[in-house]
């Protein structure tokens, strides 16, 4: 080993010592993988929602219904529409069912698997309990009510020409041949099968519980004493949202 290499190693060691002195380790915790919610914990994000206006009981907008399509990975959440500010009763009646105004809006998003190993952690009684996230989703307001209203209008109107009984005069029919050069090297990308699979899959309703039960969810983040020496088997039947 040359003198320059020895000098470089010595300088690196001095820098590490200085870093440890500036940012010392003040406490260590034993780490446990909690089995209670493993593979069942989802993180919901609301990119268009201000931090001070959460969908919660305090703001009168706690989620009412939650449903998912497990295979295609779609999620919908129904939340109340606040009527104290910026509420248009005419529009609400327009997009309602015809008898009463619309009272909820639907948030939708696609469930995604985390690209990194995201986890939720809880420090309690000098122990660090962690649970891996099964997935995350970004929920945004959807235009579901507008689409339903548009479809209702189309269904009521029926075929444009057959309903009136009149026909539009047409010019002479001419044959037009259109040819397109086929690129055999380009990859064939089609989303038709994805759309069809999404439409055919049935929604699975989930149990939506009030915020006051969140403490029980936090309790499940803790690894029970009897399972702390060894990991427990996972359960894949329930979802929990944070």
Swiss-Prot record:
GO MF term (any one): DNA-directed RNA polymerase activity
GO cellular component, one term: cytosol
Any GO BP annotation: transcription by RNA polymerase III
Signal sequence bounds: none
Residue segments, region Disordered: 1-22, 153-172
Keywords, comma-separated and alphabetical: Cytoplasm, DNA-directed RNA polymerase, Nucleus, Transcription
Primary residence: cytoplasm
Biased composition (Low complexity): 155-172
Localisation: Cytoplasm; Nucleus
The keyword ATP-binding appears for this protein: no
Protein's job: DNA-dependent RNA polymerase catalyzes the transcription of DNA into RNA using the four ribonucleoside triphosphates as substrates. Specific peripheric component of RNA polymerase III which synthesizes small RNAs, such as 5S rRNA and tRNAs. The RPC53/RPC4-RPC37/RPC5 subcomplex is required for terminator recognition and reinitiation.
Subunit record text: Component of the RNA polymerase III (Pol III) complex consisting of 17 subunits.
Name of the protein described by the UniProt record: DNA-directed RNA polymerase III subunit rpc5
Species of provenance: Schizosaccharomyces pombe (strain 972 / ATCC 24843)
